[in-house]
Amino acid sequence: MQLPFPVAQDPDQHSLEKGRLLFAGDTEFVKGVVAMSGLPDPDRLEVCFAGRSNVGKSSLINALTGRKGLARASNTPGRTQEINFFTAGESHYLVDLPGYGYANAPVPVVEKWQRLLKQYLSGRQTLRRAFVLIDARHGVKKVDEEILSLLDSAAVTFQVVLTKADKVKEKEREKVLDQVRTALSKHPAAFPELVITSSEKGWGIPTLRSIITDLT
């Protein structure tokens, strides 16, 4: 039976406030990591963000934290090959994984990134959820399927976040939602709820904050 994968509902006032308070605290860049030996101590809960280059990952992290320049997008897709750690309040790490789907990156660079990603996803006990960002204009592409399968094999629960929802009309968005739901039905690690966001308009940002805050 195919799961319905409903869109996340607006949180209640209590959850909204919890989310607001978490992201109202200090949010700082901690470090960029290129090897497992460089990971910060696992003394906080972690959520990570994955997505194709140019899917709007940096914009989403900046919108969540209310810090415009916190996460910076590289001018060249796939240029940044680091796992970037940011604090959220006193209790969480936000982890920005390198963008994938970059056709021009050298093969050794891609292979090194893939090895590091597999090691991180499989070996980080404090990782509570991966948020996989999908462009609301395009849906799940083949390169997204690769990361979703990797999350399945690492047994890391992931939740799809649709980005740039303000760039597509509602009728077209519904078609994309159907395509995403069909794609996710094949992935056992998929959390059965979608989040629709627009960093530019602020859509879905309080909802995503609340989801992150409620993870334990």
Swiss-Prot record:
GTP binds at residues 51-58, 78-82, 96-99, 163-166, 197-199. Its cofactor is Mg(2+). Residues 43-216 form the EngB-type G domain. GO terms for cellular component: cytosol. The keyword Cell division applies. It comes from the Bacteria. Disulfide bonds: none annotated. Keywords: Cell cycle, Cell division, GTP-binding, Magnesium, Metal-binding, Nucleotide-binding, Septation. GO terms for biological process: division septum assembly. InterPro entries: G_ENGB_dom, GTP-bd, GTP-bd_ribosome_bio_YsxC, P-loop_NTPase. Gene3D superfamilies: P-loop containing nucleotide triphosphate hydrolases. GO terms for molecular function: GTP binding; metal ion binding. Mg(2+) binds at S58, T80. Belongs to the TRAFAC class TrmE-Era-EngA-EngB-Septin-like GTPase superfamily. EngB GTPase family. HAMAP family: GTPase_EngB. Necessary for normal cell division and for the maintenance of normal septation. This is Probable GTP-binding protein EngB. It comes from Roseobacter denitrificans (strain ATCC 33942 / OCh 114). The gene is engB.
